[in-house]
């Protein structure tokens, strides 16, 4: 009971679709929540998808798609590894270090559990994907299509260590990170299909594609929060630096 628990999974999805000869649509949403057999292994995800297909004229078509998702991988303890899981999640006992000879209750056990479970990890990620496609047929066989799509992903993480874990300075520490990635793509195509004497088929294709990617990341840390209830760096926090691989004030 100190190390494992009963796992639980909730997976709910709702979808609706319909339309007519000119317009069709599909809208769906989902929620996924998992509580693993190890303490602190919770995972949550929500997503929404929308597809719309339009054909206002016989030679004109329009497709639009949108996808949104949010995931939460927050944990009650652990290192500040950005987006990475740990071999030992939020346990009430550390099977790699805790001796089986220790008593069930007492100061030793309380201190061990305090060190193990007091750190707080927050990890969130967002994803937005959208695309728009337009097709127009000038004459039979001659068709022009243009499309534009974008994909943006952002992940954020924060690790907080309360003041009572710092035996030297009695200062809380907070480490925050953010990373964002974006991909933008545009494509223009002109195709022409024809045949000669219904025996020789030809398919000509002209076009170009443009792709642009961008990436940005931020990192910051601070110490000396006025309260262990405040887990994020605010104005007035002490500056920090790295010493022997540790964040110190």
Identify what each model region corresponds to.
Residues 1, 36-41, 47, 51-129, ...:
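Surface-exposed loop/interface segments of Gram-negative outer-membrane beta-barrel transport/assembly proteins
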Residues 141:
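Active-site and adjacent substrate-binding regions of carbohydrate-active enzymes
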Residues 1-39, 77-80, 114-122, 135-137:
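Residues embedded in well-ordered regular secondary structure
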